[in-house]
């Protein structure tokens, strides 16, 4: 539902077209979800059918991680799979801090989800910056200087998820994702809370308004709560 609210409810037609392109150019799961959203908007199907179509694909590709029926799955695994850049794979390489010697390495493990460790402190923006470029344990074969791990996306990035399980970090309104040519600024669009197989979310629109959604209490609608910046960080990180 959060992806649907991002795609359709909070913004206008032009933004829907942008999200359509983002979904279709990401992977089969988001492309299928987009098709389901379009059918719902035209009154030809339901949001539940859109969800079930993606769930069937997930189960077919990995029945262990994504079981059918009423059995739950890992939220982290679900997010990783849903956002994995199947068509636009990022580049991961090691670069020497002294002679700039570069080694390309397997980038299949680089997705659009960053896990924030329990020991992390600072803002999400700072943590993400360190994640995208940090010191490795290896040294350069040419000059024995330390090698830095650098992640760069082949195209300007449009969607990224962060898994925050600790409250010692500060949620950032914007973050920067480095591309091959330039960095792209991404704005915080939503927060998902989960526990006991129940999900709620907060959507942040382009004006910084926070909208709350809970399928049990708000049904198919979202309610406007506050402005981003007026809600304390502890309250933002809990629901």
Predicted regions and their residues:
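UBL (ubiquitin/ubiquitin-like) substrate-recognition surfaces
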Residues: 1-239
């Amino acid at each position: 539902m959060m992806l649907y609210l991002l795609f359709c409810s909070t913004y206008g037609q032009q933004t829907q077209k942008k999200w359509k392109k983002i979904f279709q150019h990401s992977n089969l799961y988001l492309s299928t979800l987009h098709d389901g959203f379009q059918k719902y908007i035209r009154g030809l199907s339901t949001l539940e059918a859109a969800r079930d179509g993606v769930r069937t694909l997930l189960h077919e590709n990995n029945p262990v991680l994504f079981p059918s029926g009423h059995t739950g799955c890992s939220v982290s695994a679900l997010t990783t799979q849903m956002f994995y850049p199947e068509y636009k794979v990022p580049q991961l390489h090691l670069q020497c801090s002294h002679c700039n010697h570069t080694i390309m390495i397997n980038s299949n493990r680089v997705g659009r989800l960053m896990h924030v460790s329990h020991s992390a402190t600072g803002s999400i923006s700072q943590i993400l910056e360190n994640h995208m470029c940090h010191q490795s344990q290896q040294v350069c074969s040419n000059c024995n200087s330390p090698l830095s791990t650098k992640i760069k996306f082949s195209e300007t990035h449009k969607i990224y998820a962060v898994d925050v399980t600790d409250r010692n970090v500060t949620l950032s309104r914007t973050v920067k994702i480095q591309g091959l040519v330039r960095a792209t600024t991404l704005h915080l669009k939503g927060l998902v809370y989960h526990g006991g197989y129940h999900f709620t979310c907060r959507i942040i629109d382009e004006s910084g308004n926070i909208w709350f959604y809970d399928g049990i209490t708000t049904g198919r609608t979202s309610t406007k709560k506050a402005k981003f910046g007026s809600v304390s960080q502890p309250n933002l990180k809990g629901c």
